[in-house]
């Protein structure tokens, strides 16, 4: 067993940190796209205060 590898992934600390940056950046892109999508939907069909989705 390699002492530099971290259980349970088998990645080194440096590899894990690199992977974490990719995952974090991917999440940021996902959230950004979701925010833009929500703004566009709200602009087309406002919700709340008597909107179509509120009884």
From Swiss-Prot:
Keyword Magnesium in annotation: yes
Binding site for a bacteriochlorophyll: 38
Subcellular location(s) per record: Cell inner membrane
Topology feature Cytoplasmic, residues: 1-21
Membrane topology: Single-pass type II membrane protein
Coiled-coil stretches noted in the UniProt entry, renumbered to this chain: none
Broad class of where this protein is predominantly found: membrane
Periplasmic topological segments: 45-55
Highest taxon in the source lineage: Bacteria
Cellular component, GO annotation: plasma membrane; plasma membrane light-harvesting complex
Gene Ontology terms for molecular function: bacteriochlorophyll binding; electron transporter, transferring electrons within the cyclic electron transport pathway of photosynthesis activity; metal ion binding
Family per record: Belongs to the antenna complex beta subunit family.
This protein's name: Light-harvesting polypeptide B-800/860 beta chain
